[in-house]
From Swiss-Prot:
Transmembrane segments: none
Protein's UniProt name: Large ribosomal subunit protein eL8
PROSITE patterns: RIBOSOMAL_L7AE (PS01082)
Species in which this protein is naturally found: Saccharolobus solfataricus (strain ATCC 35092 / DSM 1617 / JCM 11322 / P2)
Gene that produces this protein: rpl7ae
GO biological process, any: translation
Annotated keywords: Cytoplasm, Ribonucleoprotein, Ribosomal protein, RNA-binding, rRNA-binding, tRNA processing
UniProt-listed InterPro entries: eL8/uL1-like, Ribosomal_eL30-like_sf, Ribosomal_eL8-like_CS, Ribosomal_eL8/eL30/eS12/Gad45, Ribosomal_eL8/Nhp2, Ribosomal_eL8_arc
Length: 127
């Protein structure tokens, strides 16, 4: 199965696992937004520290604007393979296409590490 058109770079599984862990920690000790509408608002307002986008969203148009918007606002974003796993990490009973960490809380070090790794990955793919 090929990647969705909005997936701009490959995220290694170990990094994706750290992303979900960061979302869980931030949910408990910081502040997150769940769902594409809330995530989009957080990005537009410049509140998001990290945006997480699921790779298995259908139709793709639901989240296709997020990478472009994040780049425009200089907000880092990362992908996870499953909207179901992202929903669970957010504490939801349902899947979510995207989420944003506004205040990382106890996940601050993890979020910083994720952003550093994402920048390294994006640096390799953009050249």
């Amino acid at each position: 199965m090929s990647k969705a058109s909005y997936v701009k770079f490959e995220v290694p599984q170990d990094l994706a696992d750290k992303v979900l862990e960061a979302v869980r920690k931030a949910k408990e000790s910081g502040k997150i937004k769940k769902g594409t509408n809330e995530t989009t608002k957080a990005v537009e307002r410049g509140q998001a520290k990290l945006v997480i986008i699921a790779e298995d969203v259908q139709p793709e148009e639901i989240v296709a604007h997020l990478p472009l918007l994040c780049d425009e606002k200089k907000i880092p974003y990362v992908y996870v393979s499953s909207k179901k796993a992202l929903g669970e990490a957010c504490g939801l009973q349902v899947a979510t296409a995207s989420a944003a960490i506004l205040e990382p809380g106890e996940a601050k070090d993890l979020v910083d590490e994720i952003i550093k790794r994402v920048n390294e990955i994006k640096g390799k793919t953009s050249s």
